Amino acid sequence: MNMKKTSILKSLSALFLASLLGAAPASAKIKVAASLTDLASIASYVGGDEVEVFSIAKANSNPHFVEVLPSYMIKVSRVAVYLKAGLALDQWADAIIEGSRNNKLDVVDCSVGVDVLDKPSGKVDASMGDVHPQGNPHYWLDPANGSIVAEHVRDALTKADPSHAALFDANAKKFKAESDKKIADWNARMAPLKGISIITYHSSWVYFAKAYGLRIVGMVEPFPGIPPTAKHLQELVDRIKAEKAKILIQEPYYGDDDPKFLERQTGIKVYRFTPSCVGTGPDDYFKHFDAMTDALSKAGG
């Protein structure tokens, strides 16, 4: 009887010890949080089956303004890596990260190494609207920058789990190879539009326009984040006609009234694209460019 009790006690002790030591088994996936779906999608590609990824901001929400919720802090408290967009786009992420109280969190600025556009040359003040002092933060809309993000993801995942370093490196290289092939396809698809004049609602599309040789000749917002006046809209009407602009790209979280006015007055065609991909799966970043370039290519040269 005593031997039986001793055996039971040993078993219970072993289970208790296992529950303590087994909280994070070696086979556990690396948990990754990202500010944007684009960063999350690339992380899913590079990490493969070894990662569990989620995004804070959704594709149809304005990435400049995300409500900081306690639920986000709780989720981030359980992750190993946080992927920030950087360039002051996702400043709201700082409050989430701080509130998570996750001292082991590896915070990665995915903008490092990007050729940043629209850096202000002088002093930035409120009269200029929501101008980012470090430059335009929408760099992921040049697909070539996706490979830079993939390298950041590879390095962060390798740091979190060195045992899978070879896998992460191979996947990052595979991402680059697939990206280069797709970029060639997208360039060919968009070639007839090279040099045409376009209008955008916000400054989200500067990198996209540069990637495909599109000329942004005006924006619905006179300054980033500043609603247009009647005078500004009339000036845009005149500019659209003078420049023969055929395309207006608008984010879906902005109102339709002003783009529809410009459409009625000039015949310009409005395309509503989310700046970020809809999903966080490994192919969603590529699918986003597939959809946008396919739609725009039908506009003609």
Spell out what each predicted region is.
Residues 2-13:
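Bacterial N-terminal signal peptides that target proteins for export
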Residues 11-22:
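Bacterial N-terminal signal peptides
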